[in-house]
Amino acid sequence: MGKVYDWFEERLEIQAIADDITSKYVPPHVNIFYCLGGITLTCFLVQVATGFAMTFYYRPTVTEAFSSVQYIMTEVNFGWLVRSVHRWSASMMVLMMILHVFRVYLTGGFKNPRELTWITGVILAVLTVSFGVTGYSLPWDQIGYWAVKIVTGVPEAIPVIGSPLVELLRGSVSVGQSTLTRFYSLHTFVLPLLTAVFMLMHFLMIRKQGISGPL
């Protein structure tokens, strides 16, 4: 085992990386509320794992979406548990994100020189809400359908570009298969990719600048 470790150590300098991680200074004022961002990340990872598991059975069509969700809940081994954990962790992620934003704001963590960290955090908050909006529609039940119809109809109030925006979101003039396909693609590919990128940026900046001091 020692030879294997030495082989990797010689090439990757594992010990230096470990020392850098474990020796990072943590200010004495840090308390449990500073863990809210990490909890949000944990919820996101749970979302990725459970969401990926459900893609094996979910069918993103207006005729089969609801029945495929029913199949996951009633026929797939532990499917009910996977989907329930996905829903619970989604709610928890939104809650932890909101509390994290409040904590950062109230402790002044957005001030110089951490403005860019705050901006990436706000973008992540928008992405988190977008996850909720797109995921809510995927079962394609009555609640999901009408929620999509209302949400995608909001931009119509914008002068000049309102109607084109609505059509862009829906994929057509009315809510249908194109809308579900768009929301499924956003929920399972575009949003997770963007979230991973901005999370990496967010954590790298936190790592570089450290935790903000007390007010």
UniProtKB/Swiss-Prot annotation:
Binds 2 heme b groups non-covalently with two histidine residues as axial ligands. It is found in: Plastid, Chloroplast thylakoid membrane. GO terms for biological process: photosynthesis; respiratory electron transport chain. NCBIfam families: PRK03735.1. Keywords: Chloroplast, Electron transport, Heme, Iron, Membrane, Metal-binding, Photosynthesis, Plastid, Thylakoid, Transmembrane, Transmembrane helix, Transport. Its cofactor is heme b; heme c. It is a multi-pass membrane protein. One of its GO terms (cellular component) is chloroplast thylakoid membrane. The chain crosses the membrane at residues 32-52, 90-110, 116-136, 186-206. Heme b 1 binds at residues 100, 202. One of its GO terms (molecular function) is oxidoreductase activity. It holds the Pfam family Cytochrome_B. Belongs to the cytochrome b family. PetB subfamily. Heme 1 (or BH or b566) is high-potential and absorbs at about 566 nm, and heme 2 (or BL or b562) is low-potential and absorbs at about 562 nm. InterPro entries: Cyt_b/b6_N (IPR005797), Cyt_B6_PetB (IPR023530), Cytb/b6-like_sf (IPR027387), Cytochrome_b_N_euk/bac (IPR048259), Di-haem_cyt_TM (IPR016174). Component of the cytochrome b6-f complex, which mediates electron transfer between photosystem II (PSII) and photosystem I (PSI), cyclic electron flow around PSI, and state transitions. The keyword Chloroplast applies. Heme b 2 binds at residues 86, 187. This is Cytochrome b6. Heme c binds at residue 35. The 4 large subunits of the cytochrome b6-f complex are cytochrome b6, subunit IV (17 kDa polypeptide, PetD), cytochrome f and the Rieske protein, while the 4 small subunits are PetG, PetL, PetM and PetN. The complex functions as a dimer. The keyword Ribosomal protein does not apply.
